[in-house]
Amino acid sequence: MLASWIFAATLPADPAAVLVVSESGVEAYAEALDGIGSAFAAPGLRIVDLQSATGARDLAAALESKETRAVIAVGSRALDEVRARHAAVPVVAAMVLHGAQAPKADCHVDLDVSLAAQLGAMRALWPGRTRAGIIRNPALSRYPADALEARARKEGFLPVIVDCDKPANLLKALAALKGKVDFVICYPDPDLYNSVTIKPLVLASLEGRLPLVGFSPAFVRAGAAAGIYPDYRDSGRQAAEIAERLLRGEDCGPDTGPRRIQVAVNQRVARLLGADFRTGALPVEVFR
Protein backbone atom coordinates (compact mmCIF):
# COMPACT_ATOMS: atom_id res chain seq x y z
CA MET A 1 0.00 0.00 0.00
CA LEU A 2 1.30 3.47 -0.86
CA ALA A 3 -0.79 5.18 1.78
CA SER A 4 -3.88 4.72 3.87
CA TRP A 5 -6.43 7.43 4.43
CA ILE A 6 -9.44 8.38 6.45
CA PHE A 7 -11.45 10.18 3.80
CA ALA A 8 -12.99 13.56 4.51
CA ALA A 9 -16.36 14.30 2.91
CA THR A 10 -15.50 17.11 0.56
CA LEU A 11 -15.86 16.22 -3.12
CA PRO A 12 -18.93 14.53 -4.61
CA ALA A 13 -17.16 12.62 -7.40
CA ASP A 14 -16.91 8.84 -7.47
CA PRO A 15 -13.25 8.11 -6.67
CA ALA A 16 -13.43 4.84 -8.62
CA ALA A 17 -13.54 6.96 -11.80
CA VAL A 18 -10.11 8.40 -11.00
CA LEU A 19 -6.92 6.42 -11.55
CA VAL A 20 -3.84 7.57 -9.64
CA VAL A 21 -0.43 6.51 -10.96
CA SER A 22 2.65 6.99 -8.79
CA GLU A 23 5.78 5.39 -7.35
CA SER A 24 6.23 4.16 -3.80
CA GLY A 25 9.36 5.04 -1.85
CA VAL A 26 9.31 8.79 -2.56
CA GLU A 27 8.35 10.81 0.51
CA ALA A 28 7.03 13.80 -1.44
CA TYR A 29 4.84 11.55 -3.59
CA ALA A 30 3.43 9.87 -0.49
CA GLU A 31 2.43 13.29 0.85
CA ALA A 32 0.79 14.18 -2.47
CA LEU A 33 -1.11 10.88 -2.44
CA ASP A 34 -2.35 11.66 1.04
CA GLY A 35 -3.67 14.97 -0.25
CA ILE A 36 -5.38 13.28 -3.19
CA GLY A 37 -7.03 10.76 -0.91
CA SER A 38 -8.20 13.43 1.52
CA ALA A 39 -10.16 15.15 -1.24
CA PHE A 40 -12.59 12.32 -1.95
CA ALA A 41 -15.63 11.44 0.11
CA ALA A 42 -15.57 7.66 -0.18
CA PRO A 43 -13.02 4.85 -0.32
CA GLY A 44 -12.24 3.16 -3.60
CA LEU A 45 -9.62 5.42 -5.19
CA ARG A 46 -7.59 3.23 -7.54
CA ILE A 47 -3.79 3.46 -7.32
CA VAL A 48 -1.17 1.92 -9.57
CA ASP A 49 2.29 1.70 -8.02
CA LEU A 50 4.88 1.65 -10.79
CA GLN A 51 7.40 0.20 -8.36
CA SER A 52 5.37 -2.95 -7.86
CA ALA A 53 6.16 -6.13 -9.79
CA THR A 54 2.84 -5.88 -11.62
CA GLY A 55 2.90 -2.11 -12.08
CA ALA A 56 3.10 -2.06 -15.89
CA ARG A 57 0.37 -4.67 -16.26
CA ASP A 58 -1.84 -2.95 -13.69
CA LEU A 59 -1.46 0.37 -15.48
CA ALA A 60 -2.36 -1.08 -18.87
CA ALA A 61 -5.46 -2.77 -17.46
CA ALA A 62 -6.58 0.33 -15.56
CA LEU A 63 -6.24 2.57 -18.61
CA GLU A 64 -8.34 0.15 -20.64
CA SER A 65 -11.05 -0.02 -17.98
CA LYS A 66 -14.33 1.70 -18.81
CA GLU A 67 -14.48 2.86 -15.19
CA THR A 68 -11.50 5.16 -15.67
CA ARG A 69 -12.60 8.68 -16.60
CA ALA A 70 -9.56 10.66 -15.45
CA VAL A 71 -5.95 9.98 -14.49
CA ILE A 72 -3.76 11.75 -11.94
CA ALA A 73 -0.08 11.11 -12.70
CA VAL A 74 2.12 11.80 -9.67
CA GLY A 75 5.68 12.46 -10.78
CA SER A 76 7.39 12.63 -14.17
CA ARG A 77 7.85 8.87 -14.53
CA ALA A 78 4.14 8.30 -13.96
CA LEU A 79 3.29 10.96 -16.52
CA ASP A 80 5.70 9.46 -19.06
CA GLU A 81 4.25 5.97 -18.55
CA VAL A 82 0.66 7.18 -18.91
CA ARG A 83 1.44 9.23 -22.01
CA ALA A 84 3.34 6.34 -23.60
CA ARG A 85 0.14 4.30 -23.45
CA HIS A 86 -1.90 7.06 -25.14
CA ALA A 87 -4.52 7.37 -22.42
CA ALA A 88 -7.94 8.11 -23.89
CA VAL A 89 -9.05 10.10 -20.82
CA PRO A 90 -7.86 13.44 -19.42
CA VAL A 91 -4.57 13.36 -17.54
CA VAL A 92 -3.76 15.64 -14.60
CA ALA A 93 -0.05 15.99 -13.83
CA ALA A 94 1.06 16.54 -10.24
CA MET A 95 4.55 16.79 -8.78
CA VAL A 96 6.02 17.45 -12.24
CA LEU A 97 8.25 20.36 -13.22
CA HIS A 98 6.80 22.46 -16.01
CA GLY A 99 9.95 23.45 -17.86
CA ALA A 100 10.62 23.59 -21.57
CA GLN A 101 11.20 19.83 -21.78
CA ALA A 102 8.41 18.73 -19.44
CA PRO A 103 6.15 15.91 -20.63
CA LYS A 104 2.69 17.08 -21.59
CA ALA A 105 -0.57 16.57 -19.73
CA ASP A 106 -4.06 17.96 -20.18
CA CYS A 107 -3.86 19.77 -16.84
CA HIS A 108 -0.92 20.61 -14.60
CA VAL A 109 -0.38 21.37 -10.93
CA ASP A 110 3.15 22.64 -11.31
CA LEU A 111 5.88 21.70 -8.89
CA ASP A 112 7.60 25.00 -9.63
CA VAL A 113 7.41 27.63 -6.88
CA SER A 114 7.27 31.06 -8.47
CA LEU A 115 10.24 33.36 -8.10
CA ALA A 116 7.96 35.96 -6.51
CA ALA A 117 6.94 33.47 -3.81
CA GLN A 118 10.55 32.44 -3.21
CA LEU A 119 11.74 36.01 -2.87
CA GLY A 120 8.78 36.92 -0.68
CA ALA A 121 9.72 34.12 1.70
CA MET A 122 13.37 35.20 1.72
CA ARG A 123 12.35 38.81 2.40
CA ALA A 124 10.52 37.67 5.53
CA LEU A 125 13.20 35.18 6.53
CA TRP A 126 16.23 37.41 6.00
CA PRO A 127 15.19 41.10 5.80
CA GLY A 128 17.53 43.51 4.08
CA ARG A 129 19.34 40.84 2.07
CA THR A 130 18.33 41.82 -1.44
CA ARG A 131 21.18 40.49 -3.59
CA ALA A 132 19.70 37.31 -5.01
CA GLY A 133 21.77 34.82 -6.97
CA ILE A 134 19.97 32.39 -9.28
CA ILE A 135 21.48 29.33 -10.94
CA ARG A 136 19.49 28.54 -14.08
CA ASN A 137 19.67 25.64 -16.52
CA PRO A 138 18.72 27.13 -19.92
CA ALA A 139 17.55 23.73 -21.17
CA LEU A 140 15.04 23.25 -18.36
CA SER A 141 14.13 26.76 -17.23
CA ARG A 142 10.54 27.75 -17.81
CA TYR A 143 11.49 31.42 -18.14
CA PRO A 144 14.34 33.23 -19.90
CA ALA A 145 16.95 35.00 -17.80
CA ASP A 146 15.64 38.49 -18.62
CA ALA A 147 12.15 37.56 -17.41
CA LEU A 148 13.54 36.26 -14.12
CA GLU A 149 15.64 39.39 -13.72
CA ALA A 150 12.63 41.65 -14.32
CA ARG A 151 10.53 39.69 -11.82
CA ALA A 152 13.24 39.87 -9.16
CA ARG A 153 13.67 43.61 -9.63
CA LYS A 154 9.93 44.09 -9.37
CA GLU A 155 10.09 42.32 -6.00
CA GLY A 156 12.79 44.73 -4.84
CA PHE A 157 15.79 42.45 -5.29
CA LEU A 158 19.06 42.85 -7.18
CA PRO A 159 19.43 39.61 -9.14
CA VAL A 160 22.54 37.98 -10.54
CA ILE A 161 21.65 35.09 -12.82
CA VAL A 162 24.20 32.47 -13.86
CA ASP A 163 23.39 29.86 -16.47
CA CYS A 164 24.61 26.31 -15.89
CA ASP A 165 23.83 23.64 -18.46
CA LYS A 166 25.54 20.58 -16.96
CA PRO A 167 26.67 19.21 -13.58
CA ALA A 168 30.36 19.66 -14.42
CA ASN A 169 29.83 23.44 -14.48
CA LEU A 170 27.87 23.70 -11.22
CA LEU A 171 30.77 24.64 -8.93
CA LYS A 172 31.99 27.16 -11.49
CA ALA A 173 28.52 28.72 -11.59
CA LEU A 174 28.46 29.01 -7.81
CA ALA A 175 31.95 30.53 -7.73
CA ALA A 176 30.82 33.18 -10.21
CA LEU A 177 28.36 34.44 -7.60
CA LYS A 178 30.87 34.81 -4.76
CA GLY A 179 30.93 38.32 -3.33
CA LYS A 180 28.04 39.40 -5.54
CA VAL A 181 24.98 37.99 -3.79
CA ASP A 182 23.60 37.32 -0.31
CA PHE A 183 22.06 33.95 -1.15
CA VAL A 184 21.72 31.58 -4.09
CA ILE A 185 18.41 30.12 -5.30
CA CYS A 186 18.72 26.64 -6.77
CA TYR A 187 15.83 25.63 -9.01
CA PRO A 188 14.63 22.01 -9.09
CA ASP A 189 16.76 20.23 -11.67
CA PRO A 190 17.50 16.49 -11.57
CA ASP A 191 20.38 16.96 -14.00
CA LEU A 192 22.27 19.54 -11.94
CA TYR A 193 21.37 18.45 -8.42
CA ASN A 194 21.75 14.80 -7.50
CA SER A 195 23.50 12.50 -5.06
CA VAL A 196 26.84 13.11 -6.78
CA THR A 197 26.74 16.92 -7.01
CA ILE A 198 25.01 18.03 -3.82
CA LYS A 199 27.83 17.34 -1.35
CA PRO A 200 30.57 19.26 -3.23
CA LEU A 201 28.09 22.07 -3.88
CA VAL A 202 27.29 22.37 -0.17
CA LEU A 203 30.99 22.33 0.74
CA ALA A 204 31.67 25.06 -1.83
CA SER A 205 28.80 27.14 -0.46
CA LEU A 206 30.28 26.92 3.04
CA GLU A 207 33.77 27.80 1.83
CA GLY A 208 32.44 30.70 -0.23
CA ARG A 209 29.96 31.78 2.45
CA LEU A 210 27.13 31.58 -0.05
CA PRO A 211 23.90 30.36 1.56
CA LEU A 212 22.00 28.01 -0.72
CA VAL A 213 18.22 28.14 -0.97
CA GLY A 214 17.16 24.62 -1.91
CA PHE A 215 13.96 23.21 -3.35
CA SER A 216 13.18 20.26 -1.07
CA PRO A 217 13.43 19.10 2.55
CA ALA A 218 16.15 16.65 1.49
CA PHE A 219 18.23 19.49 0.04
CA VAL A 220 17.97 21.42 3.30
CA ARG A 221 18.95 18.36 5.33
CA ALA A 222 21.92 17.89 3.00
CA GLY A 223 23.24 21.38 3.71
CA ALA A 224 21.26 24.12 2.01
CA ALA A 225 20.87 26.99 4.47
CA ALA A 226 17.18 27.28 3.64
CA GLY A 227 14.58 25.65 1.45
CA ILE A 228 11.36 26.81 -0.21
CA TYR A 229 9.14 24.17 -1.77
CA PRO A 230 5.49 23.26 -2.34
CA ASP A 231 3.20 21.89 0.32
CA TYR A 232 3.12 18.47 -1.33
CA ARG A 233 -0.05 17.36 0.40
CA ASP A 234 -1.92 20.43 -0.80
CA SER A 235 -0.52 19.96 -4.32
CA GLY A 236 -2.07 16.49 -4.32
CA ARG A 237 -5.36 17.95 -3.20
CA GLN A 238 -5.20 20.53 -6.00
CA ALA A 239 -4.78 17.71 -8.52
CA ALA A 240 -7.78 15.88 -7.05
CA GLU A 241 -9.92 19.01 -7.28
CA ILE A 242 -9.01 19.40 -10.95
CA ALA A 243 -9.85 15.73 -11.61
CA GLU A 244 -13.21 16.25 -9.93
CA ARG A 245 -13.94 19.21 -12.22
CA LEU A 246 -13.08 17.06 -15.23
CA LEU A 247 -15.50 14.36 -14.05
CA ARG A 248 -18.24 17.00 -13.97
CA GLY A 249 -17.47 17.88 -17.59
CA GLU A 250 -15.83 21.19 -16.73
CA ASP A 251 -12.61 22.62 -18.09
CA CYS A 252 -9.58 22.13 -15.88
CA GLY A 253 -8.66 25.79 -16.22
CA PRO A 254 -5.17 27.23 -16.67
CA ASP A 255 -2.14 25.40 -15.34
CA THR A 256 -1.54 26.35 -11.75
CA GLY A 257 1.35 26.37 -9.33
CA PRO A 258 1.40 25.47 -5.65
CA ARG A 259 -1.23 27.24 -3.55
CA ARG A 260 0.86 26.76 -0.46
CA ILE A 261 4.59 26.66 0.10
CA GLN A 262 6.73 25.42 2.94
CA VAL A 263 9.91 26.99 4.25
CA ALA A 264 12.70 25.19 6.07
CA VAL A 265 16.01 26.23 7.62
CA ASN A 266 19.11 24.21 8.40
CA GLN A 267 20.01 25.80 11.71
CA ARG A 268 23.54 24.39 11.87
CA VAL A 269 24.44 25.54 8.35
CA ALA A 270 22.83 28.95 8.86
CA ARG A 271 24.91 29.41 12.00
CA LEU A 272 28.12 28.45 10.19
CA LEU A 273 27.35 31.01 7.48
CA GLY A 274 26.29 33.74 9.90
CA ALA A 275 22.81 33.84 8.39
CA ASP A 276 20.56 35.29 11.08
CA PHE A 277 17.29 33.99 9.70
CA ARG A 278 14.12 35.26 11.42
CA THR A 279 12.31 31.98 11.82
CA GLY A 280 9.51 33.66 13.76
CA ALA A 281 8.52 35.84 10.80
CA LEU A 282 6.69 33.01 8.99
CA PRO A 283 5.97 29.31 9.54
CA VAL A 284 9.34 27.58 9.26
CA GLU A 285 10.50 24.01 9.79
CA VAL A 286 13.88 24.05 11.51
CA PHE A 287 16.32 21.22 10.90
CA ARG A 288 18.92 21.04 13.65
What is the predicted function of each stretch?
Residues 6-288:
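Short hydrophobic alpha-helices and adjacent helix-cap/hinge residues
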Residues 1-3:
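Bacterial N-terminal signal peptides that target proteins for export
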